[in-house]
Amino acid sequence: MSTLVSLPTAAPAPDYQSIDRPLNFSNAAAAKVRELIQEEGNAELALRVYIQGGGCSGFQYGFEFDENRAEDDLAVATDGVTLLVDPLSLQYLMGAEVDYTESLTGAQFVIRNPNAKTTCGCGSSFSV
């Protein structure tokens, strides 16, 4: 797993292991991830959500499938599907919801992040 070096120094992340559910992984998102994992044919995969520098607002969200879980990753399970977040990204995602939406304009994973001060029009980047 790579270290994200472009992020500014932030306050230490809260002890997320003592928080009941620091990040919400919706049923709709879990169902879509399950479908994509079945298409990949690898039941060991989990969806990793991460933050990296970039985008029009300073930070951007990233999604990838990962079969490796680091010891300090947060793992959130919904309906038997796992979402992974590294501690550095988690400090920017505390209290957020990872959802999946479908509309006339398309389908996408969406992050509703209460820590974001501003977001870009497409919702892929934010500032804190």
Swiss-Prot record:
Gene3D superfamilies per the UniProt record, alphabetical: HesB-like domain (2.60.300.12)
Cofactor(s) this protein requires: iron-sulfur cluster
Signal peptide start-end: none
GO biological process: iron-sulfur cluster assembly
Key words of the record: Iron, Iron-sulfur, Metal-binding
Protein residues bound to iron-sulfur cluster: 56, 120, 122
Domain of life from the UniProt record: Bacteria
Cofactor note: Binds 1 iron-sulfur cluster per subunit.
Gene Ontology annotations for the cellular component aspect, listed alphabetically: cytosol
Listed GO MF terms: 2 iron, 2 sulfur cluster binding; 4 iron, 4 sulfur cluster binding; iron ion binding
Job of this protein: Required for insertion of 4Fe-4S clusters for at least IspG.
Subunit annotation: Homodimer.
Entry's family note: Belongs to the HesB/IscA family.
Protein name, per record: Iron-sulfur cluster insertion protein ErpA
Organism field: Xanthomonas campestris pv. campestris (strain ATCC 33913 / DSM 3586 / NCPPB 528 / LMG 568 / P 25)
